[in-house]
């Protein structure tokens, strides 16, 4: 079994830059990090695994269905904009209780973190943009196949297109993680955390922050 640790749900606020003591300017992503509220504690005895379920933000009551409303009411927690789970070690479960809050204190400046988000959706795209295919000649007798993908396979044998063939299709809007980003600054008063570099998704998208799994 792998080593699990508590994570945090934030919202991408945008990008900026920070000047270091030596005068160097580095790009950072600002993440809005309001307190996460614990909704449920899952244990291996009851649920088959150990995890902490959290929510964040708020949602209008008309947008919360009956099962969710009952789930939040049982925990005596305000309905948030979603539910997320973080696997933790069994020995860590005692540090959390239903209704308590998880703050930025679980991270420190200089720490390496992994961040997961949903990439920007690009809609239906061709093979050149989606898979970095090479374009055909612009001239020299080519008048039909400037951006065509080319051959999709062979003839009667095998008589089919192999699964996984790179073709046109929907691009983006998938779950993606970036690893080993350094925490540059934590602003507890303004509920912001700045990490070095870029993270997946558009501004306003929810992201999951965890301690780096590979260092």
Swiss-Prot record:
Any single GO BP term: translation
Post-translational modification comment from the UniProt entry: Methylated by PrmB.
GO molecular-function term, one example from the UniProt record: rRNA binding
PROSITE patterns, alphabetized: RIBOSOMAL_L3 (PS00474)
InterPro entries, per the entry: Ribosomal_uL3, Ribosomal_uL3_bac/org-type, Ribosomal_uL3_CS, Transl_B-barrel_sf
Keywords: Methylation, Ribonucleoprotein, Ribosomal protein, RNA-binding, rRNA-binding
GO cellular component: cytosolic large ribosomal subunit
HAMAP family per record: Ribosomal_uL3_B
Role played: One of the primary rRNA binding proteins, it binds directly near the 3'-end of the 23S rRNA, where it nucleates assembly of the 50S subunit.
Assembly description: Part of the 50S ribosomal subunit. Forms a cluster with proteins L14 and L19.
Family affiliation: Belongs to the universal ribosomal protein uL3 family.
Protein name per the record: Large ribosomal subunit protein uL3
Source organism phylogeny: Bacteria, Pseudomonadati, Pseudomonadota, Gammaproteobacteria, Lysobacterales
């Amino acid at each position: 079994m792998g080593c699990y640790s508590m994570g945090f749900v934030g919202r991408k606020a945008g990008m900026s830059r920070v000047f270091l003591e030596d005068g160097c300017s580095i790009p950072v992503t600002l993440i809005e990090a309001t307190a996460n509220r614990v909704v449920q504690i899952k244990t291996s005895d009851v649920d088959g695994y150990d995890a902490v379920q959290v929510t964040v933000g708020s949602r209008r009551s008309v947008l919360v269905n009956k099962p969710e409303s009952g789930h939040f009411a049982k925990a005596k927690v305000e309905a948030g904009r979603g539910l997320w789970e973080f696997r933790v070690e069994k020995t860590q479960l005692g540090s959390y209780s239903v209704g308590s809050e998880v703050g930025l204190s679980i991270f420190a400046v200089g720490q390496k973190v992994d961040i997961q988000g949903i990439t920007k959706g690009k809609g239906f795209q061709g093979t050149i943009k989606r898979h970095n295919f090479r374009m055909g000649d612009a001239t020299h007798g080519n008048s039909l196949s400037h951006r065509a993908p080319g051959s999709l396979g062979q003839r009667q044998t095998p008589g089919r297109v192999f699964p996984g063939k790179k073709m046109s299709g929907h691009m983006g809007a998938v779950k993606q993680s970036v690893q080993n980003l350094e925490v540059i600054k934590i602003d507890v008063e303004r509920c912001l955390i700045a990490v070095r570099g870029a993270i997946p998704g558009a501004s306003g998208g929810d992201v999951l922050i965890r301690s780096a799994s590979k260092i």
